[in-house]
């Protein structure tokens, strides 16, 4: 690792004009200390900062870069689309094609494009309320569904990184219809329905949680959620912004086979550009304007350049690619375990298919309380030792790590080498 002076200078400049110097809080390294690295370029499995340092990328832009950075075919598709026009404010064939691809690979019957995961979940909740005529929403402690006021209560990594129970600016009225229960506790969901009869529009859950660290649903949890919701006339919204087309060819739906009444998507379907979607049963989706009374719109929704990137990303994400990503996740998990075990550091490698994180305690964490109860103080030293040795991991203990299909044997050699001092640093942390 050479100097990071240029990153430090840019961070100082940014703090004069941008709150915290960043445009999304976790990028500020607030929970691990130090200063943000300013990235200049990326290619394949690597990131390159403004000081010329190279990093093996284990963040993948928080999930979208399944195929690696700047994949030449995706770049070419974006360039070609851009030459035809950047935005039209009118329908395009690309919107039709990507909708067909999403419907073909998931449980949804109809889909609408939006610009971000936050928009997708916000719109899905509004639609569920409009369809059922009910106001209340059940969400889970530690699950993050974007920075929608009503869903920021107990929202996991987005606020946990800064040790905030929720966000100032979210009024009591905004959160009054949000019921928060522990993740992986279907009986708590049942109790909430019994306490609020005929008031709950939907249950929203990450299909597999990735914002309290990585926490997989246990004991057919998603299926139980759907069963309880339907017993009480409510809908199940599965948030696949993170898991969709990341955890398998069919997203988390391909892992446990549970179809949400509504499902949200993002990240991989964007190819790295701003795009997301929500979809579901046709009878529900047809409550959206212009067919139905529930209003939702967006000037840049279905942007042709983003659609080109998303289509090419999905086209290239073949079953063989998922085999590679799964093998890479398994390999990384093995190296993490070996390094920490060698140093006698209590840990568990949390897994949800190809997503993973490190819990610094014995045994698997099943909810946000479990994840917070670990030795989280070990993570900053662990993270910085990796970073100093050229490995760019997620800069929060409550975030998920992502691998791409572009990782090489040489990358894994670098990871293995960097994990030795990182595990030692974690063991010495107090």
Swiss-Prot record:
Functional pathway: Porphyrin-containing compound metabolism; protoporphyrin-IX biosynthesis; 5-aminolevulinate from L-glutamyl-tRNA(Glu): step 2/2
Recorded coiled-coil stretches: none
Catalytic activity: (S)-4-amino-5-oxopentanoate = 5-aminolevulinate
Pfam families hit by this protein: Aminotran_3 (PF00202)
Keywords: Cytoplasm, Isomerase, Porphyrin biosynthesis, Pyridoxal phosphate
EC number: 5.4.3.8
UniProt-listed GO biological process terms: protoporphyrinogen IX biosynthetic process
Modified residues (N6-(pyridoxal phosphate)lysine): 267
Named cofactor requirement(s): pyridoxal 5'-phosphate
Domain of life, source organism: Bacteria
Enzyme superclass (EC): isomerase
Assembly description: Homodimer.
Protein name: Glutamate-1-semialdehyde 2,1-aminomutase
Species this protein is from: Corynebacterium diphtheriae (strain ATCC 700971 / NCTC 13129 / Biotype gravis)
């Amino acid at each position: 690792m050479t100097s990071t002076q240029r990153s430090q200078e840019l961070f100082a400049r940014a703090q004069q004009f941008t709150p915290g110097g960043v445009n999304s809080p976790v990028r500020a390294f607030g929970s691990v200390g130090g200063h943000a690295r300013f990235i200049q370029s990326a290619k394949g499995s690597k990131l390159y900062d403004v000081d010329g340092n190279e990093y093996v990328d284990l963040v993948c832009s928080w999930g979208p870069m399944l195929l690696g950075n700047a994949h030449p075919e995706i770049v070419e598709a974006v360039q070609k689309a851009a030459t035809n026009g950047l935005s039209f404010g009118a329908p395009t064939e690309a919107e039709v094609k990507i909708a067909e691809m999403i419907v073909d690979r998931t449980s949804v019957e109809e889909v609408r494009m939006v610009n971000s995961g936050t928009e997708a979940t916000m719109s899905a909740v509004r639609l569920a309320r409009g369809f059922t005529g009910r106001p209340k929403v059940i969400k889970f402690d530690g699950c993050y569904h974007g920075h929608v006021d009503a869903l920021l209560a107990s929202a996991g990594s987005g606020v946990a990184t800064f040790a905030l129970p929720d966000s100032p600016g979210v009024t009591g009225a905004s959160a009054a219809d949000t019921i928060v229960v522990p993740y992986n506790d279907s009986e708590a969901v049942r109790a909430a329905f019994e306490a609020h009869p005929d008031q709950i529009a939907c249950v929203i859950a990450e299909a597999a949680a990735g914002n309290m660290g990585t926490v997989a649903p246990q004991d057919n949890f998603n299926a139980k959620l759907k069963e309880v919701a339907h017993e009480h006339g409510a809908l199940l919204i599965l948030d696949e912004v993170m898991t969709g087309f990341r955890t398998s060819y069919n997203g988390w739906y391909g892992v446990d086979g549970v179809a949400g009444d509504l499902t949200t998507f993002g990240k991989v379907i964007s190819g790295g550009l701003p795009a997301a979607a929500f979809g579901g049963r046709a009878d529900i989706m047809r409550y959206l304007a212009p067919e139905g009374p529930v209003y939702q719109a967006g000037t840049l929704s279905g942007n042709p350049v983003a659609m080109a990137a998303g289509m090419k990303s999905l086209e290239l994400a073949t079953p063989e690619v998922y085999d590679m990503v799964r093998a890479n996740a398994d390999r990384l998990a093995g190296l993490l375990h070996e390094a920490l075990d060698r140093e006698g550091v209590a840990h568990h490698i949390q897994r949800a298919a190809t997503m993973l994180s490190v819990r610094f305690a014995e045994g698997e964490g099943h909810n946000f309380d479990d994840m917070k109860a670990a030795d989280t103080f070990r993570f900053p030293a662990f993270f910085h030792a990796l970073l100093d040795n050229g490995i760019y991991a997620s800069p929060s203990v409550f975030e998920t790590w992502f691998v791409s299909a572009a990782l090489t044997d040489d990358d894994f050699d670098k990871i293995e080498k960097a994990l030795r001092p990182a595990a030692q640093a974690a063991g010495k942390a107090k």
